[in-house]
Amino acid sequence: MGKKHKKHKSDKHLYEEYVEKPLKLVLKVGGNEVTELSTGSSGHDSSLFEDKNDHDKHKDRKRKKRKKGEKQIPGEEKGRKRRRVKEDKKKRDRDRVENEAEKDLQCHAPVRLDLPPEKPLTSSLAKQEEVEQTPLQEALNQLMRQLQRKDPSAFFSFPVTDFIAPGYSMIIKHPMDFSTMKEKIKNNDYQSIEELKDNFKLMCTNAMIYNKPETIYYKAAKKLLHSGMKILSQERIQSLKQSIDFMADLQKTRKQKDGTDTSQSGEDGGCWQREREDSGDAEAHAFKSPSKENKKKDKDMLEDKFKSNNLEREQEQLDRIVKESGGKLTRRLVNSQCEFERRKPDGTTTLGLLHPVDPIVGEPGYCPVRLGMTTGRLQSGVNTLQGFKEDKRNKVTPVLYLNYGPYSSYAPHYDSTFANISKDDSDLIYSTYGEDSDLPSDFSIHEFLATCQDYPYVMADSLLDVLTKGGHSRTLQEMEMSLPEDEGHTRTLDTAKEMEITEVEPPGRLDSSTQDRLIALKAVTNFGVPVEVFDSEEAEIFQKKLDETTRLLRELQEAQNERLSTRPPPNMICLLGPSYREMHLAEQVTNNLKELAQQVTPGDIVSTYGVRKAMGISIPSPVMENNFVDLTEDTEEPKKTDVAECGPGGS
């Protein structure tokens, strides 16, 4: 019985400890009881009372069991049990009173009023603004969201002040940013998408004007302008009109603005809003569900309308420019036979002439323009052409025979590790071409040793003698024996050129026999070589200058070929610059040509037709064939030469 009593003792206050009493709040307005608010729900209250009644019955059962057990408990414990019973009775009476009071309150209380939670003020205002937005504002907001996505760094989100960018207000007179554009959209300041486009251009151009091209702000503005103009293009806007409902209503709302009456403003707002939503759904459904033919027709009509609008705008701009010119520009067509052949569509042309005299460094206007200044440096790739390289698969690699010396009978005789042909094919190649010598080897060695000293030459000659069994030395001796004869012949030619025949008397006083003797003497001294006869000393100097210029041009070509044919190192991006020798030769050629051009008339250098062609004037010239001089062709008439040969008798 003691264990059983202990078990009931632990469950004595179980329900009272874990069940909380509900809190009640009675609201009174004007002295009358209006509503009752409770933290516990009604279903929970009823279940609470039923559970408490069951709990009281359970207490009565426990009390009867205690009374039965008290008969066997001693006197000291009997008083303690009585006190417990009295406390339980008081608590039970108190609970019963509270339950009856709650039942009375529930019976006399009016119907409970559940107050809804307060709606936030901001959400209602935002909904009101969304309802009041026009289709144009919704379209502009949609475009603004697309434009701001192209600015991830938020460079253009807020206005720029002088504190952020010093001197910004002095340079930029009309600042613009995304927040200002949003404010304008909110205030309904934009009447069309073109105004938003103009403000967007202004914002990007301001950033490009204030910042230098090397800065990240300039590059971001340029990139944003490029992507933004694609978003604001007519094709993208047309595609948005076909895909979004409020964009499709843009054209309809513009037409409805002119036909609306002021009397419609007194209608009920809720009904008007409901009717507007229904009509908007119907219009959107009608806009989305036309056939393909209707879509094509609408698209063609819109394209024609845009083309006509663009033509009208261009015409208006031309008229405005003509008016602002003050009579300098006219719209009349010029009737004339002269025109420019290289005329561009915008009316500009170029003059195809090279400036004859280049300005010297230090003079005003000196600015040499090269092709590399317009193209820039090579960013990727190599600066040389790809050279020819034989494919490795085309190379025949025979087997390699091995020789270990004596006592190697059982060692391998050949190595076929890197061979790509069989042993039989290798033997065939060795037997066919094994004893052939390289014929041009001696010439290649001489070319290789062209700039070397005597000792390498002796080594090369001895090597070639061994290979040719003394034939190389015999060939060299024959060549050395033939050299003195050629040298003597060339020396006589040089002395003949250096000799000058002076005339004692003027040519007019000499008779014909004397002139014939002089001509014969010149021919004898030149050993039959034809001699050029010039009309004057100036012509002879002129011809010498031309010969010198020709020689300089050949040397310049050789120097350029030598420089451009060498393979530059792989770490260099640009080509090798001209050497000092090339610069010196080019300067000499320029000075010679300048001196030669100063001694003749312009008609001797270039024809009238060539000058007119360079200027772009197309006037037919009847004497064009006579005036045209082709400097590249050789003259058909041979040079006047006097040759006289002497017989064996000296006659």
Curated annotation (Swiss-Prot):
One of its GO terms (cellular component) is cytoplasm. There is a cross-link at K21, K52, K127, K186, K197, K201, K212, K241, K305, K307, K344, K389 (Glycyl lysine isopeptide (Lys-Gly) (interchain with G-Cter in SUMO2)). Pfam families: Bromodomain, DUF3512. Keywords: Acetylation, Bromodomain, Cell cycle, Chromosome, Coiled coil, Isopeptide bond, Nucleus, Phosphoprotein, Transcription, Transcription regulation, Tumor suppressor, Ubl conjugation, Wnt signaling pathway. The keyword Acetylation applies. It comes from the Eukaryota. It is found in: Nucleus; Chromosome. Residues 35-132, 253-301 are annotated as: Disordered. The keyword Transcription applies. PROSITE patterns: BROMODOMAIN_2. The modification Phosphothreonine is found at T514. This is Bromodomain-containing protein 7. It comes from Homo sapiens. The gene is BRD7.
